[in-house]
């Protein structure tokens, strides 16, 4: 790998080795170029002038190693991102769930989590939430706690409201599912009661359950290396019911998967796939 910013191939190798022995999750599953960018950004924000300083700190402080790992993850940025996808989900997927007695949904590798809360709002709007079992998984306890106590500042809320109105101009207000305290919006605890939060390593552990009707996994795998992406997609495929839906997000694809993995496109523009 050529030198990228301050992170050389040797520096990256030292960081990976240190994280493997002191941290809670292995970085080998991530794309090296993306890792270099994220590490460089972390160093700039936290005042580390060299990789050696970063490695030294991690070697003597396991809590810092986990703090470092958490900060490398890419958080979701807004509710109802890509409004057309949510519209497609309501019109072409949720309608098929109305006859189900129980709807099982998995949102893996949460970080934030705007995706989870957008999903909960849409399920509630369509009177599907009460019969839904929504699994939200993350390797870090802090990520689970953040999602379980979601709040948005005014500017972030404005973006979510705008996205929501683009997708559903005739629906009720997004603010109806938040409590406003000063300048912050606290997400509805009532909706979050339907969520099963589980600490889970998507790279090494079996799915938290099987027989899912829907897996919402938009653009998380863009950060993974090719082999990890392939194995994750195949594992997620196995956990879906036949006829279940897999949402991977714009910019992703299903190329290179095992021939036993068979999907049909439910929406080519929004990358919503149906298991055959």
Language-model features: locations:
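Conserved AdoMet
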Residues: 2-106
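Conserved class I S-adenosyl-L-methionine
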Residues: 100-115, 133-135
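Conserved SAM-binding loop of SAM-dependent methyltransferases across substrates and taxa
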Residues: 112-127
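Extended basic-aromatic, gly/pro-enriched interface segments that bind polyanionic ligands
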Residues: 132-211, 216, 220, 224, ...
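Core SAM-dependent methyltransferase catalytic element
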Residues: 214, 256-276
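A short glycine-rich, Lys/Arg-flanked "PGG" loop and its adjoining helix->strand segment in the class I
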Residues: 230-242
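Conserved beta-strand signature within the Rossmann-like core of class I S-adenosyl-L-methionine
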Residues: 242-250
């Amino acid at each position: 790998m050529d030198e990228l910013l301050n992170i050389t191939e040797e520096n990256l190798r030292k960081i990976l080795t240190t994280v493997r022995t002191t941290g809670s999750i292995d970085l080998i599953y991530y794309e090296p170029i993306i890792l270099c960018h994220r590490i460089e950004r972390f160093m700039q924000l936290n005042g580390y002038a060299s990789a050696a300083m970063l490695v030294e700190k991690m070697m003597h402080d396991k809590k810092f190693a986990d703090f470092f790992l958490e900060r490398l993850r890419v958080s979701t940025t807004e509710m109802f991102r890509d409004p057309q996808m949510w519209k497609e989900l309501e019109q072409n997927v949720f309608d098929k769930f109305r006859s189900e007695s129980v709807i099982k949904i998995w949102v893996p590798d949460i970080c934030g989590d705007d995706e989870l809360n957008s999903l909960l709002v849409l399920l509630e709007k369509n009177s599907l939430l009460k019969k839904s079992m929504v699994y939200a998984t993350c390797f870090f306890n802090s990520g689970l706690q953040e999602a379980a106590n979601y709040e948005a500042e005014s500017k972030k809320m404005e973006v979510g409201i705008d996205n929501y109105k683009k997708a559903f101009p005739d629906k009720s207000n997004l603010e109806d599912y938040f409590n406003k305290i000063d300048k912050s919006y606290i997400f509805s605890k009532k909706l979050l009661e339907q969520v099963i939060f589980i600490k889970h390593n998507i790279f090494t552990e079996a799915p938290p359950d099987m027989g899912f009707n829907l897996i919402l996994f938009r653009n998380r795998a863009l950060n993974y290396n090719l082999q990890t992406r392939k194995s994750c997609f195949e594992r997620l495929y196995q956990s879906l019911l036949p006829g279940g839906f897999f949402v991977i997000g714009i910019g992703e694809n299903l190329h290179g998967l095992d021939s036993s993995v068979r999907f049909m496109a439910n929406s080519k523009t929004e990358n919503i796939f149906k298991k055959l």
